[in-house]
């Protein structure tokens, strides 16, 4: 999996940062997919500067209904249709997302020529496609807001082909069945259990993408043990009280959560427009003083998970 940040500014865009949107390229060899997390104004413009196009999108996850995470959605949906794209699209989001989308399309005389499903979510598991699952966790913000935990299912371990050949199993289709953990019957009547020839499963990757939030009870469960945690760092330590009063977090709070949750890497985003490049580096240093494995997301930065 890889993350591509399309927008990293909090509240309003700046000359170098658009408002929030994050692409997740699933990069699966047999089931490709491109997911979008939040869709602030101008997201479709940002998408034009990447190697991806809206036709590749199959799922959009909205954290909450504040404009800097949402106002780019109607335009993206319409442009996707006007480009002749017919692949289905599913939108997940809190209560009100359906009304927002349907109202925007209706009053502008717009529509989609592709199947569009809108799923209004609550806390809990919202998706399992057989390869990965997505769970929504409630956050602390003035509007109903969620963070998303994306977990790949464990992958089967490597098949011991050498041992199978020694046991008289010919390479070919039977190996595929054994790789799936099935039991096969050879021509001589012997039964071979694939599980006996598989190494330990390979743990899947886990990723936590937070919406806007102040410190909250669900944060630790959302982030616990993930490989990568994406979290806002709207304001610096000296402005922590102001951040919390508006349902946001400081650098210290983001980094402390990453340390307590035992994550592999913290990526900070959603930085206030008050910070220029020098100020953003200061935010990064504050986080690294608590959790060294911290990176700062800029627009179009790509991170592997």
Curated annotation (Swiss-Prot):
GO terms assigned for molecular function: 3'-tRNA processing endoribonuclease activity; metal ion binding; nuclease activity; protein homodimerization activity; RNA endonuclease activity, producing 5'-phosphomonoesters; RNA exonuclease activity; RNA exonuclease activity, producing 5'-phosphomonoesters; zinc ion binding
Active site per the UniProt annotation: 68
Needed cofactors: Zn(2+)
Broad enzyme group: hydrolase
Key word Transmembrane helix present: no
Keyword terms, alphabetized: Endonuclease, Exonuclease, Hydrolase, Metal-binding, Nuclease, tRNA processing, Zinc
EC number: 3.1.-.-
Keyword Cell division carried by entry: no
Binding note for cofactor: Binds 2 Zn(2+) ions.
Gene disruption: observed consequences: Mutants are unaffected in growth.
Residues that hold Zn(2+) 1 according to the record: 64, 66, 141, 212
UniProt GO BP: tRNA processing
Regulation of activity: Activated by cobalt and manganese. Strongly inhibited by the presence of a 3'-CCA sequence or a 3'-phosphoryl group.
Domain of life: Bacteria
Family designation: Belongs to the RNase Z family. RNase BN subfamily.
Oligomeric and partner information: Homodimer.
Protein name, UniProt field: Ribonuclease BN
Protein species of origin: Escherichia coli (strain K12)
Gene name per UniProt: rbn
